[in-house]
UniProtKB/Swiss-Prot annotation:
UniProt keyword Transferase present: yes
Taxonomic lineage: Eukaryota, Fungi, Dikarya, Ascomycota, Pezizomycotina
Any single Gene Ontology cellular-component annotation: nucleus
Intracellular or extracellular location(s): Nucleus; Chromosome
Biological function: Histone methyltransferase that trimethylates 'Lys-20' of histone H4 to form H4K20me3.
Protein name stated in the entry: Histone-lysine N-methyltransferase SET9
Database matches in Pfam families: SET
Bias-annotated ranges (Polar residues): 527-543
Originating organism: Chaetomium globosum (strain ATCC 6205 / CBS 148.51 / DSM 1962 / NBRC 6347 / NRRL 1970)
Enzyme Commission number(s) from the entry: 2.1.1.372
Molecular function per GO: histone H4K20 trimethyltransferase activity
Length: 734
């Protein structure tokens, strides 16, 4: 007899790559594109949102088939028919992959059912400047109750994959099993539950890869649902943990480095203390739109609190810290805010550089090159060269298009002494100046650049070109600049220097068959040593400083034009940096409550911290020209369910509350009167001296009829205005 086939084949478990791909596209489509005010972190390093996922289409399906008329099968079919999810579903090869994707889809769409006891929220507790997902209860949950729809699936992660996730900082959903001690990555709505050292819920494994969450104690309305990841998830013994429990106990990541624990002021001290005294500089807000309706600003915070950005103002406001849900938040903001920047007032002593005050071509703020030669700056700017440059300076000044008027030419004694070689080239530490060389090498220099040589005959370089090149070097890219020996001043004479010898005893200068290069040096008067010494000190600082090109005046015995040797670095010399261990990044000291009502999130103009009028939660509103009435969580809930948070469905047949499913019909901002009150102003009706209940009726246009005057009717002798009807003289004449 043939062997009977096995009853069932073991299903192949999901891999990490498959589960990460499913979760990324589903969180993008069903969370980020459903009125969510931030974005869920993705598992893959590069994730590009699908263009076929449109917010209006997704939210309409969820509202119609999951909230108003719940039906998971129809909602799943409608969502898979959208462009983005349909393309991804069709790209899956096997039926097993498609079924796994649909099962993961059903986990996410179930969180929008009216009987779901939680809602996806966001928090910036762990990173102040960015938000992460969290889970908030929207109805009371009893102890040992399975939190409905807060489930997921898990996959075992290898140590190599765990290291890659930690390197990319994507290890936010890793848990360690208490039995097998294996690391697993869990996905689905359960991944949004954050860690807490004294969590109110626990993770329970169901089946081979399922995860459910049970309540460990009673969870109240609006409380965050948390679980415990592991004993050493945030460092050894969770020494870097930033959960709510550690914040309340000022432990682990919230523990101060010096060991001092801040003391919170009592309610009686803050209410009855001297902070309630009269102040001329503080406007008393007698009206408050807070939920509790209390007139004491220290007990119930204002809807739009004033956040001080300077350390001085924050120190003055520290004694008036609030003792409600935002306890000590004003005190917290002081520790994390950067000090005020000191502006440099020296930059304002002179007007800024404008096109009309552009620097002249012959004015250069140049550091002299330490050539090792005695070169005088004063001697190089005298004689016919001075007059030639001065003439060219006047021409260049007159041709500037942005110059409003001509400047009067200065006498020669008042003009600045120009340099003959204004070509700029980088100078590095250890580079040998060309002026110190006495010959030409075929090999490259220390900087790796060969020496460039000009022709030695007068016919190769006309005199006209020499004059233009010497006077207007900024108009030509060439760095060579030369002059004849006849143009030298009388007190400067060409001096020949014998070629130096290398260590092998060979001459540096070489005789070529076509060209002969002899480098000359100039004598320097006694007035220049201080300038040369200062330049040498600047060159030894190791910083890369733009200096003049290493070109020198040369001459030959027969008064021919001497070539100029210019060393241009083509390759930058790599600096030798000592390999020192990189210093460890200094961990910023966290202070309890520093993530809310902090000035760090108010960098943009017209950005303000607002207290929600529904749940009293503080949130940041950008472009707060008009104050929003609700936080992002309450506003998202109202758009989806049509009710104020946390209501999701009608209470019964006798529920008469109107359900507004079109969110465009709801005004999301405060009333103008409330807006004026929270900003410390009087409502406009009071400013005009009128109340909203007793407004004067608007006067009718035209002449008013006196009392007792009969109103005219058709056919009588009275007009409609009440005046007597008289016949015209023209009609009577006829």
């Amino acid at each position: 007899m043939p062997r009977a086939p096995t009853s069932a084949i073991k299903k192949q478990p999901l891999t990490f790559a498959q589960l990460a791909a499913y979760d990324d596209i589903l969180t993008d489509a069903l969370i980020d594109h459903v009125y969510y005010w931030t974005a869920i972190p993705k598992n893959r390093p590069l994730y590009h949102p699908s263009r076929g996922i449109r917010e209006e289409e997704i939210t309409k399906i969820i509202q119609t088939h999951l909230i108003v008329d719940p039906d998971l099968a129809i909602a799943e079919e409608k969502l898979l028919a959208t462009d983005g999810l349909r393309k991804f579903h069709n790209s899956l090869r096997t039926d097993k992959e498609k079924e796994d994707f649909k099962a993961h889809l059903r986990r996410y769409i179930s969180i929008y059912l009216p009987d779901c006891p939680f809602e996806v929220n966001a928090t910036n507790r762990f990173t102040i400047d960015s938000y992460e997902a969290s889970i908030t209860a929207r109805r009371p949950i009893r102890r040992n109750e399975a939190i409905k729809y807060l489930a997921g699936t898990q996959v075992t992660v290898t140590p190599e994959e765990e290291a890659q996730l930690a390197l990319r900082k994507k290890d936010f959903s890793l848990v360690v099993s208490s039995r097998s001690k294996l690391t697993s990555l869990f996905m689905g709505p359960a991944r949004f539950a954050n860690h807490d050292c004294a969590a109110n819920a626990r993770l329970v494994t169901r089946g081979s890869a399922g995860i459910e969450i049970f309540a460990c104690r009673d969870i109240g309305l609006g409380e965050e649902i948390t679980v415990t990841y592991s004993e050493s998830y945030f460092g050894e013994n969770n020494c870097d943990c930033l959960c709510q429990t550690c914040e309340d106990n000022v432990a682990n990541g919230w523990k101060p480095k010096d060991g001092t624990v801040p003391v919170h002021r009592s309610i009686e001290e803050s209410v009855l203390g001297d902070d309630q005294g009269y102040s001329l500089r503080r406007r008393r807000r007698e009206r408050s739109v807070s939920v509790a309706g209390s007139r004491t600003s220290s007990v119930t915070p204002d809807i739009r609190p004033r956040i001080f950005k300077t350390a001085k103002n924050r120190a003055m406001a520290s004694d008036r810290a609030s003792t409600t849900d935002s306890d000590g938040i004003d005190v917290v903001a002081m520790a994390v805010a950067a000090p005020k920047r000191n502006f440099d007032t020296t930059a304002l002593s002179s007007p800024p550089l404008t096109p009309a005050k552009r620097q002249k071509p012959n004015h250069y703020d140049v550091v002299p090159l330490p050539l090792g030669l005695d070169v005088s700056r004063d001697s190089s700017a005298s004689g016919p060269v001075d007059s030639l440059i001065a003439t060219e300076d006047e021409k260049s000044t007159a041709t500037q298009a942005t110059t409003p008027e001509f400047e009067e030419p200065k006498p020669p004694s008042m003009r600045e002494k120009p340099l003959l070689s204004p070509e700029m080239s980088p100078m590095k530490e250890g580079a040998t100046p060309v002026g110190a060389l006495n010959g030409e090498r075929d090999e490259p220099t220390e900087t790796g650049a060969p020496l460039s040589v000009l022709p030695t005959t007068e016919t190769d370089l006309p005199e006209e070109t020499l004059d233009i090149a010497a006077t207007t070097p900024s108009l030509f890219p060439s760095s060579e600049c030369s002059m004849t020996a006849n143009d030298l001043p009388e007190h400067i004479t060409p001096v020949s220097e014998p070629p130096r010898l290398t260590q092998e005893g060979k001459s540096v200068a070489r005789q070529d068959s076509q060209e002969t290069i002899i480098e000359e040096s100039l004598a320097v008067p006694n007035s220049a040593p201080s300038q040369i010494q200062e330049a040498e000190n600047n060159a030894q600082q190791g910083a890369e400083t733009p200096v003049l090109g290493a070109s020198s005046l040369t001459a030959e015995p027969h008064n021919e034009v001497a070539p100029v040797i210019s060393a241009v670095s083509t390759k930058k010399k790599k600096r030798r940096v000592s390999e020192k261990p990189a210093p460890e990044p200094v961990r910023k000291q966290r202070v309890p409550g520093d993530y809310t009502l902090t000035p760090l999130l108010l960098a943009q103009p017209e950005t303000a911290w607002i207290h929600c009028t529904n749940c009293n939660t503080a949130f940041v509103q950008s472009d707060a020209y008009y104050t929003r009435a609700n936080c992002s969580r309450c506003e998202r809930h109202s758009k989806l369910y049509g009710y104020v948070w946390p209501k999701t469905a009608p209470a019964g047949k006798n529920d008469r509350e109107e359900r507004v499913l079109d969110h465009r019909l709801i005004n999301r901002f405060l009333h103008p009167d409330d807006e004026a009150i929270i900003r410390g102003r009087k409502p406009w009706r009071e400013r005009l001296g009128q109340s909203s209940s007793s407004l004067a009726p608007s006067e009718e246009r035209g002449r008013q009829r006196e009392s007792g005057t009969p109103q005219g009717t058709p056919g009588d002798n009275y007009r409609r205005s009440g005046r007597a009807r008289r016949a015209s003289a023209k009609a009577m004449a006829q």
